[in-house]
């Protein structure tokens, strides 16, 4: 498991504070929490190291029946013990990679995502403690790795797939990332890549090197309109 190197605390704090301020401007809070009983949450984990921001990803265990080997964020279905979307994301992250709640600061909730037409996924964005060391649960997680946040605006290897839903075209972003330390190649796509691009757009406030279906001048409202349209067509 590769991990980015550290940086002086004042620099790290400034980097994190700037990112937090931008994320909070895009926070939808609990605005859509009432919409479905079939609820899921994912934790979108950020880490500041070496003067840069990174996203942490997991590779699903080959033992899993659904999507084995896929790259994703920690997360899963809400349990009766979960009080809210954040509780689900934190519980799943602890089960999957050994992340305790005190090791992450939750900053914002992004616009939900309609997954497989019958599940409502809430992205919960948080900053990891800079000393956090992942301890993957082998039954659920095969690997943990980090990717620089700016890779999701200026990638080295990238392609798109076109998806059509009810007459509307959408872009699936596909990123191939080679870990510089291990040489392992990862494919990041689907909902996971969509969220990574959105977080990069919010925090870095830069135009990407590829076509997107977000409105850069009206980012969160445009995401909300797309979500509500998809929700209206779903089984939720």
UniProtKB/Swiss-Prot annotation:
Activity regulation comment: Inhibited by fluoride.
Keyword Cytoplasm belongs to the record: no
UniProt main location, coarse: other
UniProt key word Metal-binding: yes
Catalytic activity of the protein: hexanoyl-CoA + H2O = hexanoyl-4'-phosphopantetheine + adenosine 3',5'-bisphosphate + 2 H(+); octanoyl-CoA + H2O = S-octanoyl-4'-phosphopantetheine + adenosine 3',5'-bisphosphate + 2 H(+); butanoyl-CoA + H2O = S-butanoyl-4'-phosphopantetheine + adenosine 3',5'-bisphosphate + 2 H(+); decanoyl-CoA + H2O = decanoyl-4'-phosphopantetheine + adenosine 3',5'-bisphosphate + 2 H(+)
Activity sensitivity to pH: Optimum pH is 8.
GO cellular component term, pick one: peroxisomal matrix
Impact upon substituting residue 66 to A: 10-fold increase in Km for CoA
CDD domains, A to Z: NUDIX_CoAse_Nudt7
Assigned EC number: 3.6.1.-, 3.6.1.77
Residues annotated as binding Mg(2+): 92, 96
InterPro entries according to UniProt: CoAse, NUDIX_hydrolase-like_dom_sf, NUDIX_hydrolase_dom, NUDIX_hydrolase_NudL_CS
GO molecular function: coenzyme A diphosphatase activity; magnesium ion binding; manganese ion binding; snoRNA binding
Subunit structure: Monomer.
Protein name: Peroxisomal coenzyme A diphosphatase NUDT7
Species assigned in the record: Mus musculus
Gene it is expressed from: Nudt7
């Amino acid at each position: 498991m590769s991990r980015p190197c550290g940086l002086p605390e004042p620099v790290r704090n400034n980097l994190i504070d700037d990112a937090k301020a931008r994320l909070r401007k895009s926070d939808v809070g609990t605005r859509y929490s009432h919409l479905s009983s079939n609820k899921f949450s994912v934790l979108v984990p950020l880490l500041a190291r070496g003067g840069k921001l990174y996203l942490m990803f997991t590779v699903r265990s080959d033992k899993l029946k659904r999507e084995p080997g896929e790259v994703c964020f920690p997360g899963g279905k809400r349990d009766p013990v979960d009080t809210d979307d954040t509780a689900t994301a934190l519980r799943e992250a602890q089960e999957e990679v050994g992340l305790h709640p005190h090791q992450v600061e939750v900053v914002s909730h992004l616009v939900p995502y309609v997954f497989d037409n019958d599940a409502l996924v809430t992205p919960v964005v948080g900053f990891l403690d800079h000393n956090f060391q992942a301890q993957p649960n082998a039954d659920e997680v095969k690997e943990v790795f980090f990717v620089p946040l700016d890779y999701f605006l200026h990638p080295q290897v990238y392609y798109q797939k076109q998806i059509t839903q009810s007459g509307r075209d959408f872009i699936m972003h596909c990123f191939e990332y080679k870990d510089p330390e291990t040489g392992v190649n990862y494919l990041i796509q689907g909902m996971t890549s969509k969220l990574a691009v959105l977080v990069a757009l919010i925090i870095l406030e830069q135009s990407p090197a590829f076509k997107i279906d977000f409105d850069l001048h009206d980012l969160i409202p445009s995401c909300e309109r797309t979500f509500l349209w998809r929700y209206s067509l779903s089984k939720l």
